[in-house]
Amino acid sequence: MAAPEGSGLGEDARLDQETAQWLRWDKNSLTLEAVKRLIAEGNKEELRKCFGARMEFGTAGLRAAMGPGISRMNDLTIIQTTQGFCRYLEKQFSDLKQKGIVISFDARAHPSSGGSSRRFARLAATTFISQGIPVYLFSDITPTPFVPFTVSHLKLCAGIMITASHNPKQDNGYKVYWDNGAQIISPHDKGISQAIEENLEPWPQAWDDSLIDSSPLLHNPSASINNDYFEDLKKYCFHRSVNRETKVKFVHTSVHGVGHSFVQSAFKAFDLVPPEAVPEQKDPDPEFPTVKYPNPEEGKGVLTLSFALADKTKARIVLANDPDADRLAVAEKQDSGEWRVFSGNELGALLGWWLFTSWKEKNQDRSALKDTYMLSSTVSSKILRAIALKEGFHFEETLTGFKWMGNRAKQLIDQGKTVLFAFEEAIGYMCCPFVLDKDGVSAAVISAELASFLATKNLSLSQQLKAIYVEYGYHITKASYFICHDQETIKKLFENLRNYDGKNNYPKACGKFEISAIRDLTTGYDDSQPDKKAVLPTSKSSQMITFTFANGGVATMRTSGTEPKIKYYAELCAPPGNSDPEQLKKELNELVSAIEEHFFQPQKYNLQPKAD
């Protein structure tokens, strides 16, 4: 075994090897010069940041800061990733050269490294076309859901979306879809990752993206897909006459992202007057100048300009998409003059109720219920389960993330079942199963029709949400996170929970709250199952433990796949008829405080709480 100082040398030697290779292969003058400069300055610290480890290709693809080096998103790492993905697809699909793939992109850009989503998309297209594979490359920015829609609609082998969704401005990402129109799940991520490692040296034509413009293999699907998407969306318009007459006014923000024109078109498809757009945020801007984080999930801070415009135009409802328009936040002005931002779970309850109610009106035959499904992820509210139990349709829970819901929805559809709706608490909604992923464009217009319909009954969204809780039982939720940049600390925290009451003994209580069941999807343990084995798939690479409490509370602690966060989700579910939400809220707050104090132990592990 090498001496400790030898390991330092080993790292330096590896760094030298990586940078030398980079200088041979990189043809982007900005990133190439940046690396040369760091070498000349002997800036080992910065070089380690850029070359420390290759970005890991997971089921969510890639997501990292743009800049030079194998740890970052740039021209060379995009070429390398795409070469690996291309070789993997060639192995998986014998008809790849007949069917082809789709590629689209958002509006992100990083001038200092010459990187942008559009450029990355063109380089990815160049890689596939150089191998004789047809590429449907959008000529302009689109929402992320347009990629899975195109895969399904044109029956392609795969899709790539270049986006970092609602991440900070310096980031970008590479998200992939399989031929079933859903995000990839394991083992494809491992296979792609291995293929990338085997195809690192750029192929002869990799850098020359000018070649693709004259290639017969390049197709621009923009016009036809735009048309077909909105034609399909029209099938989910249930009250066209109400929409034409409605007096409800809407404000929309695309938070400097891609959503503006698509949401305008969606409203027109539903015969709704298009929403008033927040002028400072409607056009794509990779600098995101008006917000600290371009994420509507962060709540009121992102919506300040929307509220100001809504107050000015007397609009009662604000619709906010994240920058790649796959998520949606909704806020409603209350009689008190305050704005209420609905949580992802609350909007999930409203949309689930609405899509079931609308479906039921068109399908009077009760026997159809046995083939009708709704899905949500294991960290989302169980409100759909409560509605399903009472109404007679099926509810299924999946692991966290739309990759699981999209793949499960496709399985059910292939079995002849109807999937009405799927959602996750992180403001992601699949209202129309022609897109097997979250879609903020369809969710925005369906929310607008719901609000317009309720207005004819003199009801607000808030009043209808209360009616849902009264009928099906209150579901009170609370979610937040702690920030932790150290993987070892995160591991220690979760290992402490697994050995809380002595070796291999999980906690029996959290403060005064007794625990009745524990499911650990990192290890595959579930003590509510007869064989103590979890039914849902397990993953050793991520931490996730769910505690069920004797008082009807459920809390999940898990790591984030894309951010340095340990998240928690807690919910109290009451049976129908329990109409004291304030008491439930008080109890839930006490439970959350106990979890933070006893299970997170922020002082011990030096965790930073979420900033208000």
Swiss-Prot record:
Phosphoserine sites (modified residues): S165
Amino-acid positions noted as binding Mg(2+) in the UniProt annotation, renumbered to this chain: S165, D322, D324, D326
One protein family per Pfam: PGM_PMM_III
Chief location category: cytoplasm
Catalytic activity line of the entry: alpha-D-ribose 1-phosphate = D-ribose 5-phosphate; 2-deoxy-alpha-D-ribose 1-phosphate = 2-deoxy-D-ribose 5-phosphate; alpha-D-glucose 1-phosphate = alpha-D-glucose 6-phosphate; O-phospho-L-seryl-[protein] + alpha-D-glucose 1-phosphate = alpha-D-glucose 1,6-bisphosphate + L-seryl-[protein]
One GO BP annotation of this record: glycogen catabolic process
UniProt-annotated catalytic positions: S165
Ligand binding (alpha-D-glucose 1,6-bisphosphate): R63, S165, D326, R327, T400, E424, K438
Activity regulation behaviour: The phosphomutase activity is stimulated by glucose 1,6-bisphosphate.
GO molecular function: magnesium ion binding; phosphoglucomutase activity; phosphopentomutase activity
Keywords for this protein: Acetylation, Carbohydrate metabolism, Cytoplasm, Glucose metabolism, Isomerase, Magnesium, Metal-binding, Phosphoprotein
Cofactor: Mg(2+)
Bound cofactor: record note: Binds 1 Mg(2+) ion per subunit.
Oligomeric and partner information: Monomer.
Protein family according to the UniProt entry: Belongs to the phosphohexose mutase family.
Descriptive protein name: Phosphopentomutase
Organism listed in the record: Homo sapiens (Human)
